[in-house]
Every structure is written in structure tokens, then in C-alpha cells.
Amino acid sequence: MPRSQRNDNFIDKTFTIAADILLRVIPTTRREKEAFTYYRDGMSAQSEGEYAEALQNYYKAMRLEIDPYDRSYILYNIGLIHTSNGEHAKALEYYFQALERNPSLPQAFNNMAVICHYRGEQAIQQGDPGTSEIWFDKAAEYWKQAIALAPNNYIEAQNWLRITGRSEDWE
């Protein structure tokens, strides 16, 4: 039984019903419907912390989905799982792939910045201020791109850019 038919919470059930109605009304191919079902089941598993199951569903969706925009969200969600698992290098790869297909994903830029900032903090703890500055500069670059796409979001990042003197070419 597909995961979407096993949802226990109201929001997931509502989303599933709405998605099923849309799939019936909007003209789509069988392949597109199947890709969306895997994507939806992946999101459901991911929201419950079932990352292995979510990844399986996302990989199946990727094999079926041909639309670059839709693929960007699948790749982004795979990146989220790798971020949650602490696999930052892998997460960055998936965020890059998502942005190649859809350069208007501010959340991918934000997540890349967060990873770079984290690595900068790690470098400081390891007594390597030079490397930390490289990571912080990279974080600033990604946050500026996220903010350019969503100027009313990422307030903490905007403050960090100002406080650290990295906002000069952004504001």
C-alpha cells in the first residue's frame, strides 16, 4: 500500500486528497502521476523521519520525472535528508543539482550557506581561522543569493552579513 494511503495526520490526509483530485483533473501522463506519487510518499516518509524510505521514494521519482523544475524539488529534498544525516558534502551536491535545474530556490542557497557557516565554525574550533574565513565568505555568497531571491526572508542571515561586514555588495 502506498504511504499516501497510510497517513494518520489530518494535514497529510488533506494534502493527499487534494493532490489526488488535482491528478484526476489536470491532464498528466501515467508516468507523471507515478513520479508524483513517489515524490508525495517521499515527503510523507521524510516528515516522519523515515529517511531511508523517503530516499527510496525520491530516487524512484527521479527515474520517472522528466520536468527539470519538478526534479529540482526532488533533488532539494534529497539534499535535506543528507543535511539531517550530517552528510554535508553529499547535501551540497544535491543542492547544487537542484539549483542547476531551478536557480530560483532560495531555500537551497540558504541551506548551502548554513552548511558553509557550520564548517566555518568547525574550523574556528580546530584553531584554523584562515579556513574559517574561506567558509564564512562562501556562506555569505550563498546567503546573498538567497536574500536576492527572497528579500523578506533570512533575517538572521541578513544580520550576520551586516555584523560581519560582509553586506557591502549586497545592500
Curated annotation (Swiss-Prot):
Family annotation (InterPro entries) = PSI_Ycf3_assembly, TPR-like_helical_dom_sf, TPR_rpt, Ycf3/AcsC/BcsC/TPR_MFPF
What Gene3D superfamilies does this protein's entry cite? Answer: Tetratricopeptide repeat domain
Indicate whether Chloroplast appears among the record's keywords.
yes
SMART domains assigned to the protein according to its UniProt record, in alphabetical order: TPR
Q: Where do the TPR repeats lie?
A: 35-68, 72-105, 120-153
Alphabetical list of SUPFAM superfamilies matching this protein = TPR-like (SSF48452)
In terms of Pfam families, this protein maps to: TPR_1
Superkingdom assignment? Eukaryota
Question: What does the UniProt entry say about where the protein is found?
Answer: Plastid, Chloroplast thylakoid membrane
GO terms (BP aspect): photosynthesis
What are the record keywords, sorted? Answer: Chloroplast, Membrane, Photosynthesis, Plastid, Repeat, Thylakoid, TPR repeat
Protein family (similarity comment): Belongs to the Ycf3 family.
PANTHER family noted in UniProt: CELLULOSE SYNTHASE OPERON PROTEIN C (PTHR44943), TPR REPEAT-CONTAINING PROTEIN MJ0263 (PTHR44943:SF8)
Q: What job does this protein perform? A: Essential for the assembly of the photosystem I (PSI) complex. May act as a chaperone-like factor to guide the assembly of the PSI subunits.
Q: Which HAMAP family match?
A: Ycf3
Protein name (Swiss-Prot/TrEMBL): Photosystem I assembly protein Ycf3
State the species of origin: Psilotum nudum (Whisk fern)
Underlying gene: ycf3
